[in-house]
């Protein structure tokens, strides 16, 4: 979807790192070389990585899918709630990361939150996710 709107896309390979906080460090090292505006998109642990990285670097936006916020064992528990252009999608039936975690963050950040029919992977709601992501990208342009 983002490519349709002329966005460049980079997917960082984290397969060699299981620790979410080390993934944040890798993302920050990649982003420090970036000269253009960018949006971070992350799902589950990737959502945590994206929002945690945005604590340390200026981003145009953050789009999160069932983000692993406020999870035990994750180092960062306070997130930058002052930035604009944060959107979250979370499935009501997520049995891995409670939707209440996204609700808690969205209240603090006063950001867009879409609670939709679906589990952690949101596979049954892919059309809805795609539509919401397209609206998000268009609003940033």
What are these regions (language model features)?
Residues 1-36:
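Active-site catalytic motif of lipid deacylating hydrolases and related acyltransferases
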Residues 15-17, 116-123:
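Histidine-bearing beta->alpha loop at or near hydrolase active sites
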Residues 41-51:
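Gly/Ala-rich beta-loop-alpha elbow adjacent to hydrolase catalytic centers
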Residues 58-70:
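A conserved short beta-strand
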Residues 71, 92-97, 120-121:
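Acidic catalytic loop of the alpha/beta-hydrolase fold
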Residues 82, 87-90, 94:
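Short beta-strand/loop motif that positions the catalytic acidic residue
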Residues 92-111:
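Conserved loop-alpha-helix segment in the C-terminal half of the alpha/beta-hydrolase fold
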Residues 101, 123-138:
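Post-His helix in hydrolase/transferase enzymes
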